[in-house]
């Protein structure tokens, strides 16, 4: 496919020698990204740093490279390994309906016995329920950091929160492990307790991560806060300019209380496998995960003040 522009998105084909990349994430294993770029265009996206390595000069969210790779010849190589699909893209972008890269990847991982973790903001994943059930050890995680569709629309071009919640329920009801990834938690805006009560009966884990501001989007987010939430400016200044971690330390305590009050396990930086007792998902503290050294869930938190 030659370079084309569809609905304002620049799309082109790229060749890659190996679709599987050893992960440096605390959750360990391998990272797999069937696309370069992400058309959700989230204003807080840490993955925008990828532009440095791809040669793209277009704004993040306005380009998409469709990867082509040699077929995975020996899927058993990944037996027992965690394979994260969508660490710096979303495997279920709207364009996946046309290109089907993620479905092709899942088909190639048949028989691998890998632990597959899919990270998405889409409901297109329900298309692949048949494959997900066949693969066995699969987890599907949706990023949901608000129940306010207006705030969501300010931040990203992905499908509505309602559509994400509906997809989560369908996947959960199909017997597939699900995660509500409450991330990034925006100080003073994200109500993670309200989200917890919305999803507790349709997910196995609730995973919490703080908003990180770095690079070019730090100014954009702080400008947004000044414009839309001026009352929160002192809080954001304390956290993101003065590096005060007390706000999120308080949220950690709040999350632990929430877990105790609702008879939910509470863990630090782990991603335990298995299904939770219905209505009692595991709450995972992933705040300031850079404090955790090591990977493959063997790291230990080294708190900073």
Positions of PLM-derived features:
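Conserved Radical SAM active-site core
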Residues: 1-139, 147-151, 161-162, 173
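Auxiliary Fe-S-binding modules of radical SAM enzymes
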Residues: 2-15, 194-305
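Active-site beta-loop-alpha junctions enriched in small/polar residues
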Residues: 88-90, 121-123, 143-147, 183-185, ...
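Surface-exposed amphipathic alpha-helices with a cationic face
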Residues: 110, 133, 165-175, 256-262
């Amino acid at each position: 496919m030659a370079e084309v522009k569809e609905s304002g998105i620049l799309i082109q084909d790229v060749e890659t020698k190996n679709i599987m990349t050893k992960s440096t994430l605390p959750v360990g294993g391998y990272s797999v990204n069937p696309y370069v770029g992400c058309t959700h265009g989230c204003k807080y996206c840490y993955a925008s740093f990828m532009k440095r390595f791809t040669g793209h000069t277009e704004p993040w969210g306005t380009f998409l490279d469709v990867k082509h790779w040699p077929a995975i010849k020996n899927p058993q190589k990944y037996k027992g390994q965690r394979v994260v699909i969508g660490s710096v893209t979303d495997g279920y972008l709207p364009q996946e309906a046309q290109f089907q890269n993620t479905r092709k990847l899942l088909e190639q991982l048949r028989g691998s016995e890998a632990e597959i973790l899919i990270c998405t903001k889409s409901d297109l994943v329900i298309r692949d329920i048949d494959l997900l059930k066949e693969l066995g050890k699969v987890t599907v995680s949706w990023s949901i950091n608000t129940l306010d569709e207006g705030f969501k629309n300010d931040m990203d071009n992905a499908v509505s929160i309602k559509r994400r919640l509906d997809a989560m329920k369908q996947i959960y009801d199909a017997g597939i492990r699900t995660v509500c990834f409450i991330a990034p938690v925006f100080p003073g805006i994200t109500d993670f307790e309200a989200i917890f009560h919305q999803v507790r009966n349709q997910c196995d884990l609730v995973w919490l991560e703080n908003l990180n501001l770095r690079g070019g989007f730090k100014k954009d987010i702080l400008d947004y806060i000044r414009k839309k939430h001026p009352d929160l400016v002192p809080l954001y200044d304390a956290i993101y300019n003065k590096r005060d971690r007390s706000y999120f330390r308080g949220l950690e305590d709040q999350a632990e209380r929430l877990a105790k009050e609702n008879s939910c396990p509470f863990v630090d930086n782990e991603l335990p496998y298995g299904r939770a007792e219905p209505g009692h998902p595991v709450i995972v503290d992933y705040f300031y995960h850079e404090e955790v050294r090591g990977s493959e869930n063997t790291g230990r938190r080294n708190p900073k003040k």
